[in-house]
Regions:
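Buried hydrophobic residues that stabilize the cores of well-folded domains
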Residues: 1-148
Length: 148
C-alpha cells in the first residue's frame, strides 16, 4: 500500500501558501506553492516534482465583475498548453466552462445547470473539436445528472 502524507502551510491570514507531499520513507513526492492578489484571490499555483523542479504553473486572471475566470496552464518552459475560461451566473456558480488548447482552439465546453436550491443538477459536456452535429444542433458527448 502507498502511504502519502501532505503537509499544508498557511500564512497569518489562513491562506494556503504551500503544500508538500511525502511518501513512504519521507521522500518528497512533490509540492505546490500558492500566490494571491490583494483581494485574496488565488492568482498562481506552481507544481514541483520530487526533485524540486517546476512541472506546471496555473495562472488565474479575473475580470473586474468576478463573472469570469481564466486559468492558463503552463508547462515547465512557461508555454501555455491549456486554458480554461469559466463564466459564472448571478449566484456565483459556474455556468459555462470552455477548455482551450495552446493554439486557441476550443476543445470542450461544459454547461452547468442548477436546481432551485442552487445545487448542481446537470452538467452537459460538448466535444467542440470533433463536432457531433446533427441538423446543425450540437449534441453533448456526456450528460451528468445529479439527484439529491
Amino acid at each position: 500500500s502507498v502511504i502519502v502524507r501532505t503537509i499544508y502551510y498557511h500564512d497569518e491570514n489562513n491562506r494556503l501558501m504551500k503544500e508538500i507531499s511525502v511518501g513512504k520513507y519521507g521522500n518528497s513526492i512533490g509540492s505546490k506553492t500558492y500566490e494571491y492578489d490583494i483581494l485574496d484571490r488565488k492568482i498562481k499555483i506552481t507544481t514541483y516534482d520530487n526533485n524540486g523542479l517546476m512541472e506546471e504553473t496555473i495562472k488565474f486572471v479575473y475580470d473586474n465583475k468576478n463573472s469570469k475566470i481564466y486559468k492558463n496552464y503552463m508547462d515547465s518552459s512557461q508555454e501555455i498548453f491549456l486554458k480554461k475560461e469559466t463564466l459564472f451566473n448571478g449566484e456565483g456558480n459556474p455556468y459555462i466552462e470552455a477548455i482551450i488548447d495552446g493554439k486557441d482552439r476550443v476543445l470542450e465546453k461544459n454547461v452547468f445547470f442548477y436546481d432551485t436550491l442552487g445545487r448542481t443538477s446537470q452538467v452537459k459536456q460538448y466535444d467542440m473539436f470533433r463536432h457531433n452535429e446533427f441538423d446543425n444542433v450540437q449534441l453533448p458527448i456526456k450528460v451528468s445528472i445529479y439527484e439529491y
